[in-house]
Amino acid sequence: MNLVLMGLPGAGKGTQAEKIVETYGIPHISTGDMFRAAIKEGTPLGLQAKEYMDRGDLVPDEVTIGIVRERLSKDDCQKGFLLDGFPRTVAQAEALENILAELNRSIDYVIHIQVDKDILMERLTGRRICKNCGATYHLVFNPPAKSGVCDKCGGELYQRADDNEETVANRLEVNIKQTQPLLEFYEKKGYLRHINGQQDIEKVFADIRELLGGLQ
């Protein structure tokens, strides 16, 4: 099974990726992991990517696509893969189609974990961290016993700057704009399947399992 996983920040993509990989025994391939592995192996493309990353620049598409091609050609991808964080653009999606055609493969499904923006805001702005011991809480899902105080050490809880409403709203807006053309591309291809990410974790995964039931 050849899968692409999509979802906005806070949609629970990471949790579902772990469950898919554990259940179906396919590799979880994220862009960051691919870059790190290529750099560690010292491949020509990995070294090129490192140069850009060391300068703080974006790695250009031709390098990223080359690394994806190398990764998908490895033995552990013969029975399938779960791509996460790639593609990010229609140009990358078209390049992925070409790579898979070279390998006589095709995408089975693009799984889009769908969550309303207001729920994503609640999930992403609710995090609180202890200034003293670093313990993490969530005002809705994992609140401290006493408001603003760490259960473990009594330290003060704070909200990280990038978890505030304005920053989170901007981050979501940027992601929505970037994601929309990609969703439309995969909708036209017939690969796209929406999964309701507003349910509890096990129900979300049950829906994914039902979708994947016919695939080997």
Swiss-Prot record:
Question: Family assignment?
Answer: Belongs to the adenylate kinase family.
Q: State the GO CC annotations.
A: cytoplasm
Q: What residue intervals traverse the membrane?
A: none
Query: What pathway, per the record?
Result: Purine metabolism; AMP biosynthesis via salvage pathway; AMP from ADP: step 1/1
Listed GO MF terms: adenylate kinase activity; ATP binding; zinc ion binding
Which keywords does this chain's UniProt record carry? Answer: ATP-binding, Cytoplasm, Kinase, Metal-binding, Nucleotide biosynthesis, Nucleotide-binding, Transferase, Zinc
The record's Gene Ontology biological-process terms are: AMP salvage
Q: Which NCBIfam families match?
A: adk, PRK00279.1-2, PRK00279.1-3, PRK14527.1
The broad enzyme category this protein falls into is transferase
Q: What is this protein called?
A: Adenylate kinase
Binding residues for ATP: 10-15, 127, 136-137, 199
Pfam families xrefs: ADK, ADK_lid
Q: What is known of its domains?
A: Consists of three domains, a large central CORE domain and two small peripheral domains, NMPbind and LID, which undergo movements during catalysis. The LID domain closes over the site of phosphoryl transfer upon ATP binding. Assembling and dissambling the active center during each catalytic cycle provides an effective means to prevent ATP hydrolysis. Some bacteria have evolved a zinc-coordinating structure that stabilizes the LID domain.
